[in-house]
């Protein structure tokens, strides 16, 4: 069979992730094992904040989890306001999953695998946010002189139940993961559901 322009299908960046989630987060599972993909994804997001802490920027991280819904609030420097969409969509060359952690594309992978995904960046008196549905950008905004939030980022997402039909985060597993991060990154305060 000869390949022609008519026989080659090009996928959007999020379609590839949604069709092949195991390439990015490992096995799907149901959330009953720390090796399940939902924890690989969560660790990738926490790694980003831990890196910011190690560089002297992130001061603390607050995480809230219920079922497949996650909210992370990192108190740090935020990302450049004009970079929010580029930081949360599209794929970088050479990405892929390692067994223990998602690469620097963790925000993008979470975005693609979620029913809804929002990303806010707060810097000084300005803020920027982007809202997505299953990887598709639905709204974005930069607001000058209206930010009352401390600098940093907020990521909220609800993983797509079609992709994770029997999964949910077990808080006891998340607590164990966070204890490992606290031991590895001494002095980095991480809270779970307000504690």
Task: Set out the residue ranges of the language-model regions.
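GHKL-type ATPase core
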Residues: 1-9, 67-85, 93-195
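C-terminal effector/catalytic modules and regulatory tails appended to multi-domain proteins
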Residues: 1-10, 19, 27-34
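Alpha-helix capping/hinge segments and adjacent helical runs
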Residues: 13-14
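Conserved helix-loop functional segments at active or binding sites
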Residues: 19, 23-26, 51, 55, ...
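Short, hydrophobic secondary-structure boundary micro-motifs
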Residues: 26-27, 191
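Conserved ATP-binding N-box helix of the HATPase_c
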Residues: 32-61, 107-113
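Conserved catalytic core of two-component histidine kinases
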Residues: 63-65
């Amino acid at each position: 069979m000869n390949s022609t322009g008519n026989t080659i299908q090009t996928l959007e960046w999020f379609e590839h992730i949604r069709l092949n989630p195991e390439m990015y987060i490992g096995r799907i599972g149901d959330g009953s094992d720390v090796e399940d993909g939902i924890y690989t994804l969560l660790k990738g997001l926490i790694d980003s904040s831990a890196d910011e802490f190690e560089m002297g920027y992130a001061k603390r991280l607050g995480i809230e989890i219920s079922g497949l819904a996650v909210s992370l609030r990192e108190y740090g420097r935020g990302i450049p306001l004009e970079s929010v969409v580029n930081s949360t969509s599209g794929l970088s060359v050479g990405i892929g999953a390692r067994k223990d952690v998602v690469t620097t594309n963790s925000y993008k992978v979470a975005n693609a695998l979620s029913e809804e995904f929002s990303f806010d960046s707060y810097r000084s008196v300005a803020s920027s946010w982007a809202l997505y549905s299953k990887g598709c950008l639905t709204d974005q905004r930069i607001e000058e002189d209206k930010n009352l939030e401390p600098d940093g980022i907020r990521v909220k997402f609800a993983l797509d139940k079609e992709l994770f039909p029997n999964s949910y985060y077990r808080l006891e597993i998340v607590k164990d993961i966070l204890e490992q991060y606290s031991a590895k990154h001494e002095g980095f305060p991480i809270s779970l559901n307000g504690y």
